[in-house]
Curated annotation (Swiss-Prot):
It is found in: Cytoplasm. InterPro entries: Cys-tRNA-ligase, Cys-tRNA-synt_Ia_DALR, Cys-tRNA/MSH_ligase, CysS_C, Rossmann-like_a/b/a_fold, tRNA-synt_1_cat_dom, tRNAsynth_Ia_anticodon-bd. Binds 1 zinc ion per subunit. Monomer. It catalyses: tRNA(Cys) + L-cysteine + ATP = L-cysteinyl-tRNA(Cys) + AMP + diphosphate. This is Cysteine--tRNA ligase. A motif ('KMSKS' region) lies at residues 271-275. A motif ('HIGH' region) lies at residues 30-40. It comes from Lactiplantibacillus plantarum (strain ATCC BAA-793 / NCIMB 8826 / WCFS1). The keyword Acetylation does not apply. ATP binds at residue 274. One of its GO terms (biological process) is cysteinyl-tRNA aminoacylation. Zn(2+) binds at residues 28, 212, 237, 241. Keywords: Aminoacyl-tRNA synthetase, ATP-binding, Cytoplasm, Ligase, Metal-binding, Nucleotide-binding, Protein biosynthesis, Zinc.
Length: 470
């Protein structure tokens, strides 16, 4: 049975979805004022991998991940760029979709935007006021944190020990508007020139935390299975989401809370920051790094563990990914001369590896042990493909397993940069072979070089010429 580490209880628990066969999952998305950095990518890749494993196990996954497109950072960026907040949001949502597509992250079932849910946000805030959990003060609306008796449970903190400014309101005049310094903002009164919407409390905009409470429950219901995000969101963001949502509905907000680990940069394990000059965006990385390598590097570290982003670790991931690609190519190549039938011994070994993969992943998505089973599968594939005689059904079974298991990590064996179809490549290989037999080596070399320019590498083997797409 699949078990997950629940941050709320600080222990592994058997995963039992609310609806059998269905997983309802919300993951906090980016604030869209810039290109996503590798910390954002780590969260997106980790939860995409978790989603893919659920799908591999046969679950239907309703996956919701938001865009925060109303925020102080967007307002600042719009002012710097002499444009509007919606224009900034549109630009970086487009960039987000391009970057996440490049690293093979599946789009969410729904990607809601805060700005498109203002009426629902206002209604949610009004309900909290009516229940006595929120109050208006000079156009702002604040949440009474102490009134929610479970406040601090997720982050394992006592409310008296919590930092002032959980709402990101720390200026003196803002603190003065609160009944209690620990209270946090649900609605912020508009400042001159800022984007705003009319509300019962005057013109303003939503606070950050209320956006996720509204959008998650709108699409997944008052109670859903999994809420995910980075460890940095555990407090105050997720703590505040629970307080808001459960105060309004009187129901458990999310049954399981999953948090991914941090990313450090360089051999010194430095925390990424603009001031240290080590701030790295996916947009820049994939200009020089194979997006599949970045994906594989991040997907094969267990989601709760920290990741050290270094060139050496990227190189190791590239080498391991290459081994998987080679195994797939070796199986594909041998299909052309395979005989009918099944090798029962290999079939048994394959089933053992598939079982080992599932056992590992069922243990809180232990991708390290899971990918170890995949590497063993690649070795088995290579050994079998090197035999003098191979059987078609066994090759297909090995190839299918390799595709399915690596697919959980987001690996694909398609090649986007090779423009020729396989039939056309084979025709050129045949032409090259004819030229070699005619001792026209100049022509044979020219065909090889022309193919290389298009990303197609030829390998001469005892079984004949094979090609691979770089």
């Amino acid at each position: 049975m699949l078990s997950v580490f629940n941050t709320l209880t600080r222990q592994k628990e058997p995963f039992k979805p609310i609806t059998p066969g269905v997983v309802k999952m919300y993951v906090c998305g980016p604030t869209v004022y810039n290109y996503i950095h590798i910390g954002n990518a780590r969260s997106a890749i980790a939860f995409d991998t978790i989603r893919r494993y659920f799908e591999y196990c046969g679950y239907h996954v309703d996956y919701v991940s938001n865009f925060t497109d109303v925020d102080d950072k967007l307002i600042k960026r719009a002012a710097e760029d002499h444009t509007t907040v919606p224009a900034v949001a549109d630009r970086f949502i487009k960039a987000f979709m391009e970057d996440t597509t490049a690293v093979n992250i599946e789009p969410a079932t729904v990607h809601p935007r805060a700005s498109e849910n203002i009426p629902e946000i206002i209604a949610f805030v009004q309900a909290l006021i009516e229940k006595g959990y929120a109050y208006e003060s000079a156009g702002d609306v604040y949440y009474r944190a102490r009134k929610f008796k479970k406040y601090g449970q997720l982050s394992d903190q006592r409310i008296d020990d919590l930092e002032v400014g959980a709402s990101q309101h720390t200026a003196d005049e803002e603190t003065d508007r609160k009944e209690d310094p620990i209270d946090f903002a649900l609605w912020k009164a508009a400042k001159p020139g800022e984007i705003s919407w009319e509300s019962p409390w005057g013109a303003g905009r939503p606070g950050w935390h209320i956006e996720c409470s509204v959008m998650s429950t709108k699409y997944l219901g008052d109670t859903f299975d999994i809420h995910g995000g980075g460890q940095d969101l555990e407090f105050p963001h997720h703590e505040n989401e629970i307080a808001q949502s459960e105060a309004k509905t009187g129901k458990t907000f999310a049954n399981y809370w999953l948090h991914n680990g941090f990313v450090t940069v360089g051999d010194d394990n430095e925390k990424m920051s603009k001031s240290l000059g080590n701030f790295v965006t996916v947009h820049d990385i994939i200009k020089t790094v194979d997006p599949q390598v970045l994906r594989f590097f991040m997907a094969t570290t267990q989601y709760r563990r920290p990741i050290q982003y270094t060139q050496a670790n990227l190189d190791e991931a590239a080498n391991n990914l290459d081994k998987l690609r080679n195994a797939y190519r070796n199986l594909t190549f041998r299909l052309q001369d395979a005989t009918n039938g099944t090798d029962t011994a290999v079939a048994e070994q394959l089933q053992t590896l598939i079982t080992n993969f599932g056992t590992a992943m069922d243990d809180d998505f232990n991708v390290q042990n899971g990918v170890a089973a995949v590497y063993e599968l690649a070795k088995l594939a290579n050994v079998y493909a090197a035999k003098a005689t191979v059987q078609k059904e066994t090759l297909i079974a090995l190839q299918k397993a390799l595709v399915q298991l690596t697919g959980v990590f987001g690996v694909t064996f398609e090649t986007a940069n090779a423009t020729l179809a396989d039939d056309a490549i084979q025709a050129l290989i045949d032409e090259r072979e004819a030229a070699r037999k005619a001792k026209d080596f100049a022509k044979a070399d020219q065909i090889r070089d022309d193919l290389k320019v298009q990303g197609i590498m030829l390998e001469d083997t005892p079984q004949g010429v094979r090609f691979r797409k770089e």
